[in-house]
């Protein structure tokens, strides 16, 4: 699908001229595209470590697991901002989770793929909400489930080419672990809580799949990215969390080399990356599940540039800009999209440089090895502060995951494009907060009071950063009937001759609704049984027949059973 099966990796002697090889291959009539396997570097400094949360403060936030906002929750101002986290913070500039949690706090059927460094899968706030491949043994050389990836217990390390997710290599920053905590930290009363991490009881939070494309001090490649994105779609993820990008096409050349400036330029330059992302948005999910397709969410970039970075700039994806605790653009955030900024959403990303206070940054989960300083009281806390559109991005991914969790609870179905539109519409306008100037002190976190005092012209951001994502608005829109929402239906069943397929009706019926009877028009084609809302269909003769199932509400749904002979590795 999307032509990914047509791509081949070509290797040749290192002494051969790369451009000549590409030119010669492009002359072959069978070859449509020749693309270099470009090196991808992280868009952040791998030598810079996060500031840690000390143990005394950590002990003071033990109550953060409570469902309602507490005094201590002010440290997670991106989720619930009461205006007290730092001087100058303004109440309400958050993603408005607290009222949304009264309806839903997450669902384990929703999987978010974190395409990044490796996630610390055994962190005390993440372990219960990691996606787990039950057939696999972590890091094993055996592909126990036959999906083509050995040892992929929590995801896969596409840099090393094995299932060993790593997060303590020299150069690892804790980036992915920080991102994962914002989305799905367990509400267990130990540390922080994530936007869709559940209510603290088992099997209530969304799941994090670690798709590792960065490790240590090394770079990655477009090929690794494409493999990771396809893996996510094929293994159940419906949200792609991508806090990485190319450089902005409008970056100051003194800061870096400008990259793509248009959809056409990006599409023609990294064809494989684009096709992999299209594969995800069109083929993730389930036509009979909560979402048909997937949602790709990208960080806008941190280069102070008047253009967001690709791939996020592309209109098919959601691109996230960053806000500070006063609801103003973070000093570093890129802004403006070639699509007219229609795919932009703003979210809390932090801005310690504007407030001269690390608490204006985003607090989340961290490996101890990625926290700065030799003071073990701080570095062994397991929590730290980071700034960036990288931190804003998981706020949107978390709200999207919370929304899909609520849709699953209501047994509603969306096409991915419709749910993307729902997210883009579920925002609060920021234009009234974008006047005059904003001060910041560049690199205050590194150089302290020696940092130069600079100013931002806020009207330049008006209409160019998107609205602030609002979890309560997302859930309210899901309560409604707009954005293409459809009730989940009993799916058509395709089964091999003499094989059995099971349809879990609990995913389709509301709570406390049970199937009471079924009917198969031609019982010679399929044998059907019903037990505890599990509809089992066994193929007994090649052919097609209509069938129906009736539930305790008296509603009957018709579906079609198709029995075929399996050939080779699938249907022909």
Where are these regions (language model features)?
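Aromatic/histidine-rich interaction motifs
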Residues: 2-17
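Protease zymogen maturation seam
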Residues: 4-7, 26-111, 119-125, 129, ...
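Extracytoplasmic soluble-region selector
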Residues: 483-572
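C-terminal subdomain of the subtilisin-like protease fold in secreted/lumenal serine endopeptidases
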Residues: 237-244, 293, 405-500, 570-572
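Extracellular S/T/G-rich loop segment that most often corresponds to the catalytic His/Ser-adjacent loop
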Residues: 309-405
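Catalytic-core regions built around general acid/base machinery
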Residues: 263-295, 316
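Subtilisin-like serine protease catalytic core
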Residues: 88, 94, 98-222, 235, ...
């Amino acid at each position: 699908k999307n032509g990914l099966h047509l791509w081949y990796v070509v290797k040749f002697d290192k002494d051969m001229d790369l451009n000549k090889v590409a030119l010669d291959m492009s002359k072959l009539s069978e070859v449509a595209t020749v693309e270099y396997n470009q090196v991808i570097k992280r868009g952040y400094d791998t030598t810079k470590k996060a500031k840690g949360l000390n143990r005394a403060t950590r002990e003071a936030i033990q109550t953060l697991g409570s469902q309602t906002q507490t005094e201590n929750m002010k440290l997670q101002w991106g989720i619930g901002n009461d205006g007290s986290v730092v001087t100058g913070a303004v109440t309400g500039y958050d993603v408005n989770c607290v009222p949304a949690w009264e309806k839903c706090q997450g669902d384990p059927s929703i999987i978010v793929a974190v395409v990044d460094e490796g996630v610390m899968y055994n962190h005390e706030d993440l372990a219960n909400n990691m996606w787990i491949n039950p057939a696999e043994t972590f890091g094993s050389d055996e592909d126990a489930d036959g999906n083509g990836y050995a040892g992929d217990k929590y995801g896969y390390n596409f840099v090393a080419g094995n299932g060993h997710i790593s997060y303590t290599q020299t150069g690892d920053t804790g980036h992915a672990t920080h991102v994962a905590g914002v989305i799905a930290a367990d509400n267990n009363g130990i540390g922080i809580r994530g936007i869709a991490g559940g209510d603290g009881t088992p099997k209530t939070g969304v799941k994090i799949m670690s798709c590792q494309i960065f490790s240590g001090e090394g770079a990655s490649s477009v090929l690794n990215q494409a493999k990771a994105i396809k893996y996510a779609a094929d293994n159940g993820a419906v949200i792609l969390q991508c806090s990485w990008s190319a450089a902005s096409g409008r970056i100051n050349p003194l800061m870096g080399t400008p990259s793509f400036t248009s959809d056409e330029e990006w599409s023609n330059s990294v064809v494989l990356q684009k096709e992999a992302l299209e594969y995800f948005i069109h083929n993730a999910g389930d036509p009979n599940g909560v979402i048909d397709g997937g949602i790709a969410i990208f960080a806008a970039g941190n280069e102070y540039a008047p253009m967001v970075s690709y791939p996020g700039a592309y209109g098919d994806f959601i691109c996230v800009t960053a806000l500070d605790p006063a609801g103003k653009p973070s000093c570093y955030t890129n802004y403006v999209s070639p699509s007219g900024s229609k795919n932009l959403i703003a979210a809390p990303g932090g801005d310690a440089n504007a407030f001269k206070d690390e608490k204006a940054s985003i607090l989340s989960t961290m490996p101890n090895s990625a926290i700065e300083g030799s003071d073990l009281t701080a570095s062994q806390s397991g929590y730290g502060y980071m700034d960036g559109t990288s931190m804003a991005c998981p706020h949107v991914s978390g709200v999207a995951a919370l929304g899909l969790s609520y849709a699953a609870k209501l047994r509603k179905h969306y096409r991915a494009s419709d749910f993307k539109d729902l997210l883009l519409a579920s925002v609060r306008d920021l234009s009234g907060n974008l006047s005059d100037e904003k001060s910041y002190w560049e690199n205050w976190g590194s150089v302290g009071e020696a940092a130069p005092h600079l100013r931002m012209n806020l009207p330049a951001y008006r209409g160019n950063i998107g609205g602030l994502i609002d979890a309560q608005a997302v859930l309210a829109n899901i309560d409604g009937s707009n954005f293409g929402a459809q009730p989940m239906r009993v799916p058509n069943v395709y089964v091999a001759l003499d094989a059995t397929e099971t349809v879990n009706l609990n995913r389709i019926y509301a709570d406390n609704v049970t199937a009471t009877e079924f009917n198969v028009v031609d019982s010679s084609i399929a044998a059907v049984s019903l037990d505890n809302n599990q509809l089992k269909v066994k193929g007994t003769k090649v052919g097609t027949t209509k069938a129906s199932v009736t539930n305790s509400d008296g509603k009957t749904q018709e579906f079609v059973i198709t029995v075929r002979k399996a050939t080779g590795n699938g249907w022909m």
